[in-house]
Amino acid sequence: MRFGKTNQHPPGVLLDPVGEVCGATAFMAWCQNTLVWYAANSDNPKLLARFGEKFATGQILGGTGLSNPMKSFFGIEKLKLKGRKVDGGYVVRGALPWVSNLGADHFFGTIFEIENRPGEIVMFLADCSVSAITLQPCKPFLAMDGTGTYGVQFRDLFVPDDHVLAEPAGPYVKKIRSGFILLQAGMGLGLIRDCIAIMNEVAAPLGHVNRYLPQQPADFGELLADLEAETMDLARDPFNTDDSYWREVVELRLNLGEASVAAAHAAMLHCGARGYLKSHRVQRRLREAYFVAIVTPATKQLRKMLQDI
């Protein structure tokens, strides 16, 4: 995929084959594609020239640090990073608790508020290789370990103007927000498809009793088809800033999270005792499904967002 082709159609909506196999890998692919999305939609020509192609081809890896900013936009948290203007850029301090797909030479995009200028925000690329950034390993997760998730500390990080994605960041965030969410769709769509496959796999030995369960593979097949169609329809116009379109995107994301949990729960019940073995993938899919429902924007945040729109 050549850089410059992705900014018209978020590539993550096509990630469901990855999500069908592994939720953690799909999540990391979302992180990388979101980094591509940020660069593709920046108006900073020097940033585009230096990073655009390398992000898109995977020569430089990285992720997204918008969990805290996304929550701050809806009054759930305060922005955790502060920056002050200096010659040639900004100096940034603060800490982010969760940023994924990181390593010693990776980049990620995030947002700080300008000191003494409440509400004025700047989005930038953070370079994990510099000494002013410290990556703190997180405690073991229920699932999704191996995704390069760290707490990140900023100790007077110098952010050159060439690393600024958007200043001011408000209009830029409104431009990229739908794509940011639609990029997550593949995680849920792929997981639901595999849960349907799991239910079908045990139909021969257990179908005579599983037919009494209230949710069947055919039910989720119809739901999956509807979610796929809606995702692709919304992905045709990711820069639409109308409130009605934004509501549809948020509702879709909410439905994807809830459908993922429902499908994994049903698959677990269809498998019965065999699904309770650590060796069976259905218990992993259940744990991954909860991640789809709690990763930013989480189910509770999405419901608040719908209330606020």
PLM regions: where:
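Glycine-rich phosphate/cofactor-binding loops in nucleotide/flavin-utilizing enzymes
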Residues: 273-309
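Acidic-glycine-rich active-site phosphate/pyrophosphate-binding loop
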Residues: 8-9, 85, 162-170, 272
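Glycine-rich beta->alpha junctions and the first turn(s) of the following alpha-helix
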Residues: 139-225
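Short, charged, amphipathic alpha-helical segments
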Residues: 211-219, 243-250, 280
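Glycine-rich flavin
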Residues: 1-95
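C-terminal helix-coil-helix/basic helical segment that borders enzyme active sites and/or dimer interfaces
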Residues: 204, 225-258, 265-277
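Generic structural signal for well-ordered, non-transmembrane alpha-helical segments
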Residues: 190, 218-225, 250, 254-261, ...
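DPxDG-like acidic metal-binding loop motif
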Residues: 95-130
